[in-house]
């Protein structure tokens, strides 16, 4: 699979915001060197066991969600690739009826594996507005 087709499949991630993380988890490498620095903060997860558990937890937080993506940059060199994007989320917290929104800056790294391109790192944060130090 070419790299562009891989990142187009990231739209499968919308199911993650509806309590079904399996499609997004399938885009990840299941190797011991994957890392996740998620938008909810906390520790940086290392290795597929920790990352997979965190993705399950994240999926359980959402219902009725959508994710609109603004792609900023994407490229590859050899067996590595990267993707930089802004993600605009609309969702309900699981068990609640009020709609919420969040916007994240996201950087993902990919590696070409025998099964195709897989995510090996994702970093997301909500610092989308420039702020001077205080």
Short names for language-model regions:
Residues 73-75, 90, 109-111:
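Generic structural detector for well-ordered beta-strands
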Residues 21-78, 86, 100:
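A solvent-exposed, acidic/Ser-Thr-rich amphipathic alpha-helical stretch
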Residues 82, 103-130:
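Short beta-strand edge/turn micro-motifs at domain boundaries
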Residues 4-11, 49-52, 56, 105:
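Generic alpha-helical structural signal
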Residues 85-92:
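Generic short beta-strand segments
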Residues 1-27, 79, 131-134:
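Short, low-complexity N-terminal intrinsically disordered segments enriched in polar/charged residues
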Residues 88, 127-134:
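A short, hydrophobic/aromatic-rich structural module that often spans a beta strand
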């Amino acid at each position: 699979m070419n790299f562009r087709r891989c990142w187009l499949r990231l739209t499968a991630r919308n199911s993650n915001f509806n309590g079904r993380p399996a499609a997004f988890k399938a885009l990840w490498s299941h190797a011991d060197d994957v890392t996740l620095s998620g938008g909810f903060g906390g520790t940086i997860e290392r290795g597929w066991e920790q990352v997979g558990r965190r993705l399950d937890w994240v999926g359980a937080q959402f219902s009725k969600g959508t994710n609109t993506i603004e792609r900023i940059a994407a490229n590859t060199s050899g067996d590595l690739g990267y993707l930089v994007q802004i993600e605009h989320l609309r969702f309900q917290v699981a068990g609640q009826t009020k709609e919420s929104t969040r916007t994240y800056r996201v950087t993902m790294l990919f590696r070409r594996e025998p099964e195709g391109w897989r995510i090996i790192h994702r970093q997301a944060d909500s610092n989308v507005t420039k702020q001077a130090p205080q």
